[in-house]
A protein has these predicted regions:
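Conserved AMP-binding/adenylation subdomain of ANL enzymes
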Residues: 2-86
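Thr-Gly-centered strand-to-loop micro-motif
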Residues: 19-20, 91-93, 150-151, 157-158, ...
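Gly/Ser/Thr-rich phosphate-binding loop
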Residues: 38, 54, 59-64, 72-134, ...
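Active-site glycine-centered loops adjacent to acidic/histidine catalytic or metal-binding residues
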Residues: 94, 117, 140, 187, ...
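Short Gly/Pro-enriched turn/cap motifs at secondary-structure boundaries
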Residues: 136-142, 179-180
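Conserved ATP/PPi-binding loop(s) of AMP-dependent carboxylate-activating enzymes
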Residues: 141-144, 152-176, 196, 213-215
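AMP-binding/adenylate-forming catalytic core of the ANL superfamily
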Residues: 159, 164-165, 188-271
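Flexible lysine-rich "adenylation lid" loop at the C-terminal edge of ANL adenylation domains
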Residues: 278-293
Length: 293
C-alpha cells in the first residue's frame, strides 16, 4: 500500500481495491483485513460480472488472476480502456503470468506487482515490484523473511511464516513438510542470476512420457498463448500423445494448426504436440480462475 502512495506521490491517497477471488483464498482474505486497516475500501466482485461490478464499484487496484489479466490486456490492446474506469494497479497472484502480457499492461500505464504465497505460508512468500522486461514475469526475490530454496526444481520454503503442519493430519503434513522443516510447495521454478524466481509449472501437472522425458504443460501453453487466434489453451497427455486443447473461433482452427506446426519445429521431438482438440466454449476453470485439468 505504501508503494501505491509513493507512486502517486500522495501519502493521503485513498484507494479502492477490488477482489474477485473467493474468501477461502488467503490472498483475498488477507486483503480484506489489510485494506480495511489502511482505511481503504474493499470491493467484492465476481469474475462472471467483472465489468458490471467495476462500473458499479469503481476501483483503482485489483487482485488479478490470469484469465482476468488476459481480458484486461485485450481491452487495452484494442482501445477499450474506458471499460476499466479508474483501474491502474494489478496485484497478480495465484498462477503463472505471461511476461509479455504484463509488459504490455505496464506500457499502457498499469502498475504491476506479482505476489506468491499459499495458505501453508500464511500468505507470505515472495513479492515482485520489478517492471523491467527481464524481471516483470518473476514472482520476486528472497527478501530474507524466510528461507527459500529449489529442490530438484521444486520451490521450498522454511521459516516463521510457514506452517508447522496440517491440523490433526500427520500423514498429509509428512507429504509436504520434510524432516528439516522445509515446506515443499509443489510449484516448479527457476532462479536467475539476479536472484529472481520464476514459476515454470506445477509438479503434479508434469507429463512423464514412456521415454522417461518430462514435459511441463505450462511451458507449451505459454507458447500456444502467443497465437493471436487462441483464446484459451490447455496441454495434456492423451493416448500417450501430447495434446493441445484450444478454445478459438471455428474459422481460426486452421491458423491454430499452422501455428502448432511452426511451434513444433522449434521444440525437441519429445515436447512436440501431436494432437489438437478444439472447443468453441471457454475451458472450465475453478473458483480461483485456474484451468481445471
Amino acid at each position: 500500500m505504501a508503494r501505491f502512495c509513493q507512486l502517486k506521490n500522495d501519502p493521503d491517497l485513498l484507494v479502492s481495491h477490488m477482489t474477485l477471488l473467493p474468501m477461502f483464498h488467503l490472498g483475498a482474505f488477507g486483503c480484506l483485513f489489510t485494506w480495511a486497516w489502511m482505511g481503504w475500501a474493499q470491493n467484492l466482485g465476481s469474475l462472471r460480472s467483472f465489468y458490471k461490478d467495476l462500473k458499479r464499484m469503481p476501483s483503482q487496484d485489483m487482485a488479478a488472476v490470469p484469465v482476468l489479466v488476459q481480458s484486461i490486456h485485450h481491452d487495452l490492446m484494442t482501445g477499450k480502456q474506458d471499460k476499466l474506469g479508474d483501474l491502474w494497479a494489478l496485484n497478480c497472484m495465484s498462477a503463472m503470468f505471461d511476461p509479455q502480457t504484463l509488459m504490455d499492461l505496464h506500457d499502457h500505464g498499469m502498475v504491476i506487482s506479482q505476489l506468491y504465497g499459499s495458505t501453508e505460508t500464511t500468505g507470505g512468500g515472495l513479492i515482485n515490484f520489478a517492471e523491467d522486461a527481464k524481471h516483470i514475469g518473476s514472482i520476486g526475490k528472497d527478501d530474507g523473511h524466510c528461507e527459500i530454496k529449489l529442490d530438484n526444481g521444486e520451490l521450498c520454503m522454511r521459516g516463521g511464516d510457514v506452517m508447522l503442519g496440517y491440523y490433526k493430519d500427520p500423514e498429509g503434513t509428512a507429504e509436504v513438510v520434510d524432516a528439516e522443516g522445509w515446506f515443499h510447495t509443489g510449484d516448479l521454478a527457476r532462479v536467475d542470476e539476479d536472484g529472481y524466481y520464476f514459476l515454470t509449472g506445477r509438479k503434479k501437472n508434469v507429463i512423464i512420457l514412456d521415454s522417461g522425458e518430462n514435459v511441463s504443460p505450462e511451458e507449451l501453453e505459454g507458447l500456444l498463448a502467443k497465437c493471436p487466434a487462441v483464446k484459451e489453451c490447455l496441454v495434456k497427455e492423451k493416448g500417450k500423445k501430447i495434446c493441445a486443447v484450444v478454445c478459438c473461433e471455428e474459422a481460426d482452427q486452421q491458423a491454430v494448426r499452422d501455428f502448432i506446426t511452426e511451434t513444433n519445429r522449434t521444440l525437441p521431438l519429445y515436447k512436440r504436440m501431436s494432437a489438437v482438440e478444439f472447443s468453441a466454449q471457454p475451458l472450465p476453470r475453478n473458483a480461483m480462475g485456474k484451468l481445471m485439468r
